[in-house]
Amino acid sequence: MKIHKKYGVRVPATTANIGSGFDTLGMALGLYNEAYFTPVNELSLMKSHIDIQGEGAGKIKHGADNMVLQAMQAVAGKVGKEIPGGELKLINQIPLARGMGSSSAALVSGAYLANQLCGNVLNRHEILNIVTELEGHPDNVAPAIFGGFCFSIVKDKFVLTEQWKIPDTWKAVVAVPDFELRTEDARCALPDTYSREDLVQNIGAVSFLMAAVMMRRGELLKVGLADRIHVPYRLPLISGAEEAMKNADKKGCYGVTISGSGPTIIAFSSAEKAYEIGAAMVDGFKLHHVCLLYTSDAADD
């Protein structure tokens, strides 16, 4: 049996929507999944052996239902090449179904592994388009690929994205409750239509959110994170979230909102207040759920 060299990739967790930036804004966090692939010629891709360590061990699907393998197959199909199966090792730090981009991380991992196997024929923008097609929206995918704070839009079936560096003095404080909330279920909670007033308010809010990041003014985040499109409809699905958010606000965070579609809550703060804010968020959740806490810088690559 001929065994080839090992290929590898590391992909960050991401927080998407970021309050008023529904389906368009995302940011990479300093928490990572790693994926390693060793080709074995005698195996077909979907018959690859998968070893999973960390988050998702015992839960993540194998075979044709595995998202890493699906992305590998999609990239191979796009470039017109066939890649063999092999030994796939996943070392996961990103919690599943918590609003931290676990599915995007899996798809990006597979796309990058396949691109390496095919000779690195695709650039990052081409990978972004392929993975967005698989994921359905670019808000998590873009920061998983480019890092930093990304704003993205799909225009004529092509993803346009720009990246901005989050201020070094900001900390992301992430409270992760011990239950899952599937993106599909969170989307079902949203209304089919919105009032003009709500849409105008969100346009104004996202303008302040962009100003906060680009001008490095944390005090603008409270206005910038105020959302009327998804947050009010998803909060009732997350027991303890309102208490966690109120506690973070009382402790002086710049702003706080749902991470992705939830149930994770993310606050932004100065480094000096990060621990105190995180403890207050955990305290808000503790009447309902056990809660994990991460304090992170933005990941820039």
Language model regions located:
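Short, well-ordered amphipathic alpha-helical segments that serve as non-catalytic structural scaffolds
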Residues: M67-A76, V206, A244, M281
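Short amphipathic alpha-helices in soluble, non-transmembrane regions
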Residues: I277-F285
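Conserved, helical-rich catalytic subdomain that frames metal- and/or nucleotide-binding sites
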Residues: A175-V176, R187-K251
